[in-house]
Structures are given as C-alpha cells and as structure tokens.
Amino acid sequence: MNHIYKLKSYGIGTDRRFYGVANKTLETPDFLDPVRESFDWFLHVGIPEAFDRIFPIVSANGKLEISFRRGSLRVEKPENEYLAIREAKIKGKTYSARVYVTLVKVHSEDGEMEEQEILLAEFPFMTQGGTFIINGFEKVVVSQLIRSPGVCFRENVRNQQADDLFNKVEIIPQLGSWMEIFHKVTGNQVDTVKFRIDKHKNIPLLSFLRAIGFTNETVRKYFGNSPELLESIRRHKLESLEENLELIYRIVRKDDRITEEGLKNLIPSIIFNERRYNLASTGRFMLNAKLNLVERISQTYLAEDLVSKKNKILFKKGTYITRQLALEIQEKFNNEEIPLSEIEGVDSTIYARQLEITRNENLWKRFYVAIVKVWPNKKSMLQESEPVNVIATDPNLNEKTLVLSDIIAIVSYYFNLLSNLGKSDDPDSLVNKRIVSVGELLQNQFLIALTKIEKNSKEKISTKSDLSQLTVKSIINNKPIYNQFKNFFNSSKLSQFMDQINPLGEMASKRKVTSLGPGGLNRDTAQFEVRDVHTTHYGRICPVETPEGQNIGLILNFSVFSRINQYGFIITPYYQVKNRIVDYSKVHWLAASEEFDKSFAQSGVEIDQNNRIIPDKLTVRKNQTYLVLDAEQVNYIDVSSMQMTSISASAIPFLENNDANRALMGSNMQRQAVPLIKSEAPLVATGIEEAVARFSATNLRASISGKVTYVDAKKIIIDDGEKPEIHYLRYFEKSNQETLILQKPTVKVGDKVKKGQLICDGPSTDNGELALGKNVLVAFSTWYGYNYEDAIIISEKLVKDDVFTSIHIQEQTIKFRSTKAGNDILTAEIPNASAKSRLHLDANGIVIVGSEVDTGDILVGRTSPKGEDNPTAEEKLMAAIWGKKALAQKDTSLRVKNGEGGTVIDVQILSRDQGDNLEEGVGMLIKILIAQKRKIKVGDKMAGRHGNKGVVSVILPVEDMPFLEDGTPVDIVLNPQGVPSRMNIGQVLELHLGMVAKKLKTKFVTPVFDGIKIETIKKLFDEANIPESGKFKLFDGISGQPFENPVSVGYMYMLKLLHMVDDKMHARSIGPYSLTTQQPLGGKSQNGGQRFGEMETWALESFGATSVLSELLTYKSDNIQGRNLLYNNIISGGKIPSPGTPESFNVLAYELRGLLIKLEVHKNDQENQEVEEIKDPLELPEIPSNFIDEYNQDGRIELNKLEEFADFDEENIDFDKLTR
C-alpha cells in the first residue's frame, strides 16, 4: 500500500518521509558565507588595495614621501567575541577592532628613512553572525545591485522626454564620467552621431574623434561608409585638433578659462587618469569580453584571407564563419598567431602628452587592434560589395582606464550594429549588473577617508619649514576614517537596522539585495522593466521574494545557492552532463554571461543508477527560453529543486501549487512570525528548516569537538582534552523588534559533540529545525459569518494552553543630568506619588527585578529641580549674595508607559563613576527591561505559509467549536472562500498531508518543485484510513447538528505575526495638538486622535447630523478658544459655549488672500454673542438675524418669524447656526 519513500533525518533525530524524485542534491551552503567572505576580503585585500591607490603621499616640493609597507596590516580583535558584543549592547557602544599599519617616511634630500607602526583606525568589526553592533544596536549592510562597469550597446531605446527612438552605447566606469554615443533612428532625415560626457550638452562624435587625433580619412577607413557616419562628416566643419578640443572644453568645463595647458590635459584628465577614471577589474573584464570579434563575425563571410605571422593562410576569403570558427579566430588573435594591426594616421599628440605625465610606456603598446573584414550575408559576398570592418580591442589589455584600442573598438561595434553585426545588450540582465557587497562598500568609504588624509597630510607638510621634525604619526591623522565609517553606518541607506523577529527574518535581511542607494536607482522613477523578473535571475535572485508596495522588484533576495565571483557577478552551481551522463563529482559555478548557448535541465529529471538520464526528450532552458530537446543535447543539470528560490520561498511547502503573488506574501509573512513560548517544527516541512537553524546566528554551534562537561541555562562547557571551551547562551535578551531571544541547551553532560554541531535551540527553533508556528487542527468552513473576509475563528484552547503565546521585551530608559539649576536625584521619596505607584521600588528608588508592574507604576524614582522661569533682578542679586537657595523639586520619575506593563526582568545601571561613556551632562543612565506575556487575542494577525492571512475575529469556547465525529473540536475555522480566488492551493494540500502525518504519527518533507504528488497523497489517504476526498463530517458545536456537506479538515502550520492588537489599539480623550495647524496629532506614539477627513464629513452631512459635525470640526479639532472654554465649562459645570471659528477657516482665508480674493468677516455684538457673517461678492438680499431659514419641500427658502413661536427662549439661540 505504501508508495515508495526514503526516510531522511533532519535536525536532532527527526525522521521525515521524502517522496521526491531529485537524485543527488547539493548540500545547502552556509548562508552567511558570502557576507563573511566579503568582509574578510576587505580586511586582507581591500585595505591594501586602497593604500596602493593613494600612497605614496608626496609633498608638493617632492622632498618628503610617505609610503605604505605591504604586508604590515595588523588587526587587533577583542579576545572574547561574546562578552565584547554583550558589553557593546548593554552600554550602547560599537563592537570594533583596531587596525595597525606600518608607514615609511623618506627624505629625498638625505635618503633618511623612518618606519613607524600607527593605529590606522578603530572601525566596526563584523560579528560571526555577519552583523555589526553600532551604538548597541545590531545592523546589517545590505548588498547593492548596480549596473556593471563596462560597455552597453542598445538599439531602439525610447527617449524619456520625446517619442523618438535612439541607438546608443554607454561606456560606464566604476569611477569617473559616464560617456554615451548615440543617434536618432526615427524620423525622415539621417541623424548625425553625437557624443556626451555625463549630463553635459551633446558634442558631435567627429569632434571627439578629431580631439583624440583622427582625421576624416582615418574615420572612413576604420568605420566604413554608413549614411549616419557620412552625414556626420558632411555636417562637421571644425578641422583642426585645437578647434575640436576647444569645443569640448567649452561644454565640459564651461566655467573655466581656456588655456593651452588646459586643452592639452582635457582628454587625458577625463579618460586616461586612473585617479579620476577607473574601470576596475570588472570593467576591464567586461570591455575585453564585449569588444572581441566573436559576436560580430559569427554567421558572416570572410572578405579577405586571414594570414599568420609566418604568412601562412589560416582562413580563406569567402569562408562562412560559424560561432565555433569565430571563437577559433579570436583565439588566434589572443595568442598572437594572427598579428594585430597598428592604428595608422592618428595624431598621437595627446598620447605623447599623457606619456609625459604618467610615464606609462604601456600607452604606446595600445595602438594595436584586431581587424577582420567580413560580408554580413551571402548576397553581399556574391555581389562582392564593400566589406565591413570589424575591429576588436587588443585582447591582452589589462589597463584600468580606457585606451585608444577600446575607443576604436567601441565606435566600430556601434557602426557594425547598423550592418546587423553584433547584438545589443539588455541593461536589466544580470550579465550587465553586478553586486557590490559589504567589503567593497567599506573599501569605498575607506578610499574616501584616505583621500581626505592625503589632502590633510600634504597641507600639514607644506606648512612646516623643518621636515625632519615631522613624524609619521604627526602627519597622518586617522580622524577622517573614524568619521567616514561613523557616517556610513549611521546614515547610509545600505546600513540597516536588522530584522531580528525570528531566525528566518534575520537570515533574509543579511541576504537582501537592493537596487536603491547611492549609485543605484530611485524608487520614484524606476520603470516596470527594471523591477520585472528576468530570465538571468534563475538560480541567482529569487523571483518570488520582494516587498509589496513601491519597493517591489527593487529590493530582492539571493537564491539559496547563489554566490558572488571575483568580479561581483552572481554565480549559481550546476552539474555537467556529457552524452546523457551526469557528473556529480564536480560542481560548476556559472555567471549569467557563461550560460549563452548552453542547455540546462531541471534537477527532477529521472536518472538511473549509472547517472544516465532516462527520458529521451526533455524540457530544457536555453538562451532565455524553454525548448524540448534530445537528452544528448543537455549540457548541465540543476543541483537542487530549490535552486531558483530564496530561503524564505523555499520554506513554503507545495510552492509550485501556489499563485506567485500569494507565495510572495507567504515568504514575507514568515519573516514576521513571532517566536512562541514553545516552538514546534512543522509536520509538513520542505527540508530547508534544518539549514536555517544550523546557520542562524541565534543558534549556537560547538566551536570544538569534545565532551560536554557542564550545562546550565547560561553556558555550556565542552572539553576536548586540552582546554575547556565555554559557550555562553543568550538568556532573556531583547531583539531589535522587541521579541525574546532565549537559547535552550539541547545537549546533556556527558554527550559527545562534533565541531559545528548545534548545541542549543534558539528562538523559533525546535530540535535543530526552524519552527515559526504551530500545527493546529483547521477546518475550512463558514461559521455564522464570523470568518467573513479572511477573519479567523479560534478556539479558547489555544489561549488557555498558551499555544500562540509569545514573550515581548520592552526597554525603558531614564537619564540623570547635571544642569546649572541643579542635579537630578535618584530617590524613593517622590513628592505627591501614591503608595501604590511606589510599591515596587527598593530603598534606592529602583524597581525590584521580578516585580509585576502596570501602566503608571514608577520604575525609577527621580526628582529634578523645578528651576525658576524668569527670576527678577532683585532675586538674582539675592541669590548672588546669599548663594543658591534650595530649589523646589519636581517629580520626573520613569513610569510604565501605556500598555507596557509586565514583569521586570533586568535592571542595567550605567554610570560615569564606573567609567561608562555617557553623553555630555549625563551622570547616570538606568535601563529597565520589562517582559510581557502576550496570549493570542481578538485583533491579532495570523497567517499560514501560503499567503493566507487574516485577523482573529472571535475566540470561541471549546464546546462551541465545530467538532469531528469522534468528538475532537477543531482549533481554527478558516473561510473556504479565501482559497479559490487567491489560487494558493498549496494550503489545501498541506492540510490533507498534515492530517495524514498526524494519523500515521510521522512527518513529511516536501521540497519546493520536488514535492509529494497529488496521486501519492491519495494513496496516503488509504494508508491513514482517511476518506478519498480528504473531507470529514463536521458537527456544529452549538446545535450539535452535522453540517450539510463534508468539510476539509486537517493540520495546518499557522503563524502568529508581529502585527498584534496590543501595539495598535489606541484611544484618545485629551492629548497634544500640532503647533502649526492646531489640530490634534496623529498616531499612537504621539497619543494622537483619529483623523476625521473630508469624506467622513460628507457622510455626516448626508445625514444632516449638524451638532455632531459642529463639535468635530470645532471643539474637537482646531477651534483654540472654543476648546479651552469648553474644557473649563465642563470642569466648572457651566453651559457648553457656542463654537467659534476653527483655525482651518483662517487658513482658507489666507489662501484666498493669496489668490487676490478678499474675504471680510464682520462681527456684530448682539446679546454678547458673536455673529460672523461673510460678505459674498454677489449682492444677495440680506437675511435678518432674527429669522431662521429652512428649506421647504420645493427647495425654496421660507422665512418664518421667530415671534410665531410661543415658548421662545432667547437665551438658548445659537446665533452661529442662524447666520450659517
């Protein structure tokens, strides 16, 4: 009866049934390795590299030089990471390391050398968990996805401003000016080709080419006779080099005066100066890869013989060039079998000038290019029409700047595209995008700081006459480095407060990728194309996980297996396939650019025992599309079924059965699940839960192999026979999101452990597996309308048994200041405080740990000097003569904030006397940590893993819940209407499989895209004696009658999310008002009111609720005098005054005045009541104040005299209403 399955072990002794078909999947890597490797690169490569770019620092007169001694870098870390981090968090410090370097000072006159090691900086150091502790808070540096340096050719690009289409090429450096060559392709006339540097005005391309030494003849010789080029030559009138340089100078340096020296330096300073223009290794790699021959000469015909250095014909004229042949021709140029051509007819004045400045002999070598003449098609070959020159750059270039060969090859490629040679690039492809990781971001900050140090040092040297007195230490000031890092970690968009709700959220925030930030995109202007999922994202960036809202598609997550190569491109692993045989011995890591023309099969392909692919035909991925090919044509196979998705998306079982939008919500909401008091791993898992638990920083792994000799709630000691190693556990710590971090040991004294083994369960972890929620019995049924619109009905059992109970920790702080008026005093004797509020204080006035405190209770007793606001001259004189008199003290104690009562779990006292570093004027700081036990209640948000979210609407007694035939009451009732339209069928399959798991007392693992098939679930129904439909007879708990139809009932994994009603529920009676508008503030944090807006006003107007409206728009809003008067009258028992003018009316009057409309308000004193009347510019008949107007049924105004009313009480007339 059993369908074939394997038992796989997960976590600490949990066996799960696996029914998938994937053969050998690659083990999940340590998810934090890329972050740690990047920081390691910064320390050992990035810092020395930055020094090489800036040093040696040479004085203006050349007499003094300061250089950096390679290999002298020394990093001094704190000895015990755990204790250093704990201290940093408690005391609000930064966890940092000291970096020392050795610098050498050389006097050129006497050759005297002085070597000195200096403290370069103390900057934030990465923890083992891939985070930084900045001012006591845990932060992460997010990776950035930006356009790669290099060259990007694009055809038919739409201009933002107009509807014209353009061809263009962008030359993108890592540092320096962006350059563009472009021309319009729409319109009747042939357009000239233009050139642009940064956002400056357009320059004719001919001007730029002339400025670097080309003549009309050389331009035509190298770049052919396309109509656009001929038109550009025809229209261009400036002949000489100087005239063209002058034109460019006026545009690029429009505010500078033209000098001969300036003209000579213009082009070299923009392009050839490595300090100002740098392609970096990535840019050079991209240029060499793009500007070769292969793409352009494939599928063309040779128009001349290709001859070797020994004059041997290697490739004959008329040969059809396949891609393979094109690769061969390129290879011959690479190893110089076919000689490169020297660029002729170019005026090398600029290069001579550049050579003079930089003494860079390599510049002369860069006058060589690879030239091949081809016919684009057979027709042009047969007609022997003029061939097209295809020019490639020198393949052995390694310069970090542009050189002449590059410029010629770029212009050649641009004109080749007009002959349909080569292909345009996709700027949204990962071929043209790279990742800037934490190490590179820190290196950029370090470079900026070193540039400032260089400038300061040169200034310092120039002011000293006697250079011998200067030491390295006195010249180099490390303050810029400290300031630069401080600014970066505190204010950069890429340095973010870590999401620490649960281990999954923490892992996801460390693997986040953003397209925003400096040098990136702007969320307001980013187009749909940039945000869209791209085919190159496969295995590199998750297509599912991204935020909802305006950041959609701009903030992304790495896929499970993705890594970053030396150039910053994302690489993903594959197994190679040759002649249907899969080679599992070696993993091949490929970047997006290396996937061209290769075919990739999925990991779920059936493979026999000899690793041979069984099916003859397969659906494969090739060149951004899916094809059905023979098995022999497959080149690679995926390493795992979860290769495409991120960690969060991979944790959703039956992901393949869900709509992508709901999967997106599911992966985002899993990160918001609060850790519960008792964690429980899911019955239906995906297999990634163990990896998340193992690599999470909230769990602890053994640092050595050995025997456990001691275990308690705060530490575990492991002895390897040489030296016992103490592992400290995190005990009742507060996370960034105020959830609880508590580690519980999973080992006992005497256990033997291996290095890297989990030795404790952290928050949301159960036996070494991620456990975000609970397995509960769920029925899909309606129940008296209480689960209408995604509302959730839960059983009281979940509340009583603390199933969804979580602990939250709030921190409250108080500072004791010293001022001129006097000092704050810590005391238990607080003036005018009730005995009840002081109940939990000790003799010093600090709350006792373990106390149960409620809103308004005093946590720390503090009195502050009242201070006299404006003492008179006589009082000042008396104080000066007799000394300060004892000022009266006022109560400024720290009280429990509204809704933040709970159990005091810790008191932390920081004092200047103990050597703690506190801000100016603060002598002592006390932190109180209060733990709140929150049971689930009406208004809390809950969710499953499939994007099925809702709010608890009612908590029913167990006896009222619907129950099964055996009397088992269900825990949760969900609305079945929430499934069909959302198309997340995964939740139904999980429900059924969960029921099977419970009946068979087993657990399942169903990885994404390799899960249990529906046929298998049906067979499992038989095994578990469950009806084939998976539905059960359900009875109403109230009436005891069975429901009309069978209902789907099963076990589903439900999460309680951070959006809890306790944080959101709020009401206001009296509170603060805005200073500018005089209207109540908004929001719970400011004790604000509920905004009653324009549309709400319309609703009341439609009902004619005048008195309610009058109150809302005046007393309760911005009628300043009215509300004060009202308050006083309520206190004194007086009558409610009539409403005056709201402040917003005055704003309207000022607004109209700005539009030159004068609004007059005439006030008549009548019976001591103010009557405001607004003169209308139209002359309407004046209605006397002793008339009431009212509409009759015809809509005409009828005027009734007041005298007709017998019981007329003059005192109670609201004259404001009359005039209105």
Swiss-Prot record:
One of its GO terms (cellular component) is DNA-directed RNA polymerase complex. It is an enzyme of class 2 (transferase). Keywords: DNA-directed RNA polymerase, Nucleotidyltransferase, Transcription, Transferase. GO terms for biological process: DNA-templated transcription. It catalyses: RNA(n) + a ribonucleoside 5'-triphosphate = RNA(n+1) + diphosphate. The keyword Nucleus does not apply. Gene3D superfamilies: 2.40.50.100, 2.40.50.150, 3.90.1100.10, DNA-directed RNA polymerase, beta subunit, external 1 domain (2.30.150.10), DNA-directed RNA polymerase, subunit 2, domain 6 (2.40.270.10), RNA polymerase alpha subunit dimerisation domain (3.90.1800.10), RNA polymerase Rpb2, domain 2 (3.90.1110.10). InterPro entries: DNA-dir_RNA_pol_bsu_ext_1_sf, DNA-dir_RNA_pol_bsu_external_1, DNA-dir_RNA_pol_su2, DNA-dir_RNAP_su2_dom, DNA-dir_RNAP_su2_hyb_sf, RNA_pol_bsu_bac, RNA_pol_bsu_CS, RNA_pol_bsu_protrusion. Its EC number is 2.7.7.6. GO terms for molecular function: DNA binding; DNA-directed RNA polymerase activity; ribonucleoside binding. NCBIfam families: PRK00405.1 (NF001616). The RNAP catalytic core consists of 2 alpha, 1 beta, 1 beta' and 1 omega subunit. When a sigma factor is associated with the core the holoenzyme is formed, which can initiate transcription. PANTHER family: DNA-DIRECTED RNA POLYMERASE I SUBUNIT 2. DNA-dependent RNA polymerase catalyzes the transcription of DNA into RNA using the four ribonucleoside triphosphates as substrates. Belongs to the RNA polymerase beta chain family. This is DNA-directed RNA polymerase subunit beta. The lineage of its organism: Bacteria, Bacillati, Mycoplasmatota, Mycoplasmoidales, Metamycoplasmataceae.
